[in-house]
Amino acid sequence: MSFKKFPRHLLSIRDLSRGEIVKLIDRSSEIKQAYKQNFQNRRSVQMSGLSSQNVAMIFSKRSTRTRVSVESAVSCLGGNAMFLGKDDIQLGVNESLYDTSKVISSMVSGIVARVNKYSDVATLAKHASCPVINGLCDTFHPLQALADLLTIKETFKSFDGLKVAWVGDANNVLHDLMIANAKVGIHTSVAKPKDVNVRDDILSIVNEAANENGSTFEIVNDPKVAVKNADIVVTDTWISMGQEAEKEQRLKQFTGFQVTGEIMKLAKPSCKFMHCLPRHPEEVSDEVFYGENSLVFQEAENRKWTTVAVLEALLVNRGEILPPASA
């Protein structure tokens, strides 16, 4: 049985129910464990769901983790990833997004788009005849949120009652992480500068999800308040792509928001640290970033395994998100 409507897209974590998120995380873990165990035993794992199929990677922004994770995930499923950078195709320049979506989706089994604006990936999805996955835009980053949840589940075994403290900018990564946390029962406390605002429409989505799933969220202006009793502290870049000209201003704006050892001491003694990378020293000290409670490289690797699960669900299973085979 396939999903009621094909193609099914993933543009934000809001597109997934709590149950679907949990299934994707469990399936990601199952795939990861199978590959790790077979690698240790020098046996190969053969997944052929995308055999002889192509996945287009439409990237208007440079990337390390998203590109490598998507290409390796497609390979895991036996498919071929076609990287289409901003200099390779005429995305919204000499050809409309409508035309681009129609043409490319007619030749591939799926599209992963890393673009500047949410409206761009939404337009691609609206007119595509194959699934479109948001690899990052200015508003959402669902693949990162799934990798974060897998990392949290591996570490704490359960989501229930955990507290995540976010320290820093109100950006695309925060948006989907807040929504994801609210859906799976994780409490979120966000510390941001007074003159940085979380969008009202995002807060509305988070509030609805929190009410439905028994989680809470709060927004404060003091990192010391946010991290109190936190199980995980998360931060991200203060200067996203396209904001380079604002660097000096933004560094002043985020004074006092570096995650340091002193900040971590205010959280639970077992508190972990996460960062989606790339990292800059003004955001987090070396002591924390490279410390024994840092999960940053495990988190980065998990981008691959959650992407495999998403591709399998949307492309191979035609939108149906199934429980892990071992369930």
UniProtKB/Swiss-Prot annotation:
One GO cellular component term noted in the UniProt record for this chain: mitochondrion
Ligand binding (carbamoyl phosphate): S63, T64, R65, T66, R114, H141, Q144, C276, L277, R303
Domain of life: Eukaryota
Subcellular location: Mitochondrion matrix
One Gene Ontology MF term: amino acid binding
Pfam families the record matches: OTCace, OTCace_N
GO biological process: arginine biosynthetic process via ornithine; citrulline biosynthetic process; L-arginine biosynthetic process; urea cycle
The reaction(s) this protein catalyses: carbamoyl phosphate + L-ornithine = L-citrulline + phosphate + H(+)
PROSITE patterns reported in the protein's UniProt record: CARBAMOYLTRANSFERASE (PS00097)
Binding site for L-ornithine: N172, D236, S240, M241
EC number: 2.1.3.3
Pathway in which the depicted protein is active: Amino-acid biosynthesis; L-arginine biosynthesis; L-arginine from L-ornithine and carbamoyl phosphate: step 1/3
Active site residues according to the UniProt entry: C276 (proton acceptor)
InterPro entries, sorted: Asp/Orn_carbamoyltranf_P-bd, Asp/Orn_carbamoylTrfase, Asp/Orn_carbamoylTrfase_sf, Asp_carbamoyltransf_Asp/Orn-bd, Orn/put_carbamltrans
Alphabetized UniProt keyword annotations: Amino-acid biosynthesis, Arginine biosynthesis, Mitochondrion, Transferase, Transit peptide
Role description: Ornithine carbamoyltransferase involved in the synthesis of arginine from glutamate via ornithine and the urea cycle.
Protein family according to the UniProt entry: Belongs to the aspartate/ornithine carbamoyltransferase superfamily. OTCase family.
Record text on subunit structure and interactions: Interacts with trx2.
Protein name per UniProt: Ornithine carbamoyltransferase, mitochondrial
